[in-house]
Amino acid sequence: MITKQQVLEFLKDYDLDNITIATICSHSSLQIFDGARKEGFRTLGICVGKPPKFYDAFPRAKPDEYLVLEDYEDLINRAEELRKKNTIIIPHSSLIYYLGRENFTGMAVPTFGNRTSIEWESDRDKESRWFLGAGIQMPKKIDDPHDIKGPVMVEYEGAKGGKGFFVAKNYKEFSELVDHTQKYTIHEYINGTRYDLHYFYSPIRNDGYTLSKGSLELLSMDRRVESNADEIFRLGSPRELIESGICPTYVLTGNVPLVARESILSRIFSLGEQVVEESLALFGGITGAFCIEAVITDSLDIKVFELSSRIVSGTNLYISGSPYSDLMQKRLSTGRRIALEIKEAAKSNQLDKILS
């Protein structure tokens, strides 16, 4: 893994008046490029083969230049070239997936956020330790499938985009659906409304919703649209569907906007605060954008089952701002908020606090 000291050495050669914001052309890159351009940065899109043609349809978000690779792993070998352009990499899920975790953490280019958070997020045991230390309610984990007494969610290790999930209500259903060649986690199925909560933690701002160090913002929230789970039950009851050979899947295909009851916002902020404070104690903080995936029950309990320590695709709903971010700054997207953080840190000589 690249060290903080190495990153600081790279920054000594940077022209901070000519920073380039770069990411892989996927996931939330249009939003990232749009936000960077609004804050006066040059942008660089990373892609394999020729640049995506559909980017031409969005001129305000199309990057100023492209870095075309034969393979995403070749990005590691282009680090010096990127540094000469004063590049800061903005990670998103696709970037980490295409590069691989080891390549991402070892990439010799200054990167927004704390790369150590990937290790804590992707390791289920470490993530559980993080959540439990933060005092967060989580769905009960079931170690032995024979102990399944009601609906459970089974998730395969490394599930991406909603692939690798299934629901079972007893051991028999579990046995019929499980792939024993893969590692999996079983936890109770929580009945409620799913919320993806989009936060931003700034270690360099000391106004707004302040923490022991820095401040916390709630930028937006969304709910996932999943195929085929969101439409399948129009065809019949779950048992009828299974008998017909049709099983629900949870592949992410899009997102829809949400706002929460105002009375819940206090708990939503407390939840984010607990996550950040514990991250500061464990590994130096979850800097920048992050998302808590939770279910809010009919008794208004919030149970957390996942965390993403970077910008998530649900924020793409709010390129022109959300009902929450508009109350802080007009037309503030998560992509633009990232660019603002970099801009403010560069001006105040605090890039060391937000890059890794």
UniProtKB/Swiss-Prot annotation:
List ligand-binding residues for Mg(2+): E293, E306
Q: How is the cofactor bound?
A: Binds 1 Mg(2+) or Mn(2+) ion per subunit.
Q: List GO molecular-function terms, semicolon-separated.
A: ATP binding; ligase activity, forming carbon-nitrogen bonds; magnesium ion binding
Enumerate the residues binding 5-amino-1-(5-phospho-beta-D-ribosyl)imidazole-4-carboxamide. H27, S94, N255
Disulfide-bonded cysteines? none
Q: Which residues bind ATP?
A: 145-196, 226
Q: Which PANTHER family match?
A: 5-FORMAMINOIMIDAZOLE-4-CARBOXAMIDE-1-(BETA)-D-RIBOFURANOSYL 5'-MONOPHOSPHATE SYNTHETASE, 5-FORMAMINOIMIDAZOLE-4-CARBOXAMIDE-1-(BETA)-D-RIBOFURANOSYL 5'-MONOPHOSPHATE SYNTHETASE-RELATED
Family membership: Belongs to the phosphohexose mutase family.
Q: What does this protein do?
A: Catalyzes the ATP- and formate-dependent formylation of 5-aminoimidazole-4-carboxamide-1-beta-d-ribofuranosyl 5'-monophosphate (AICAR) to 5-formaminoimidazole-4-carboxamide-1-beta-d-ribofuranosyl 5'-monophosphate (FAICAR) in the absence of folates.
Q: What is this protein called?
A: 5-formaminoimidazole-4-carboxamide-1-(beta)-D-ribofuranosyl 5'-monophosphate synthetase 2
Instruction: Give the source species.
Output: Methanosarcina mazei (strain ATCC BAA-159 / DSM 3647 / Goe1 / Go1 / JCM 11833 / OCM 88)
This chain is encoded by the gene named: purP2
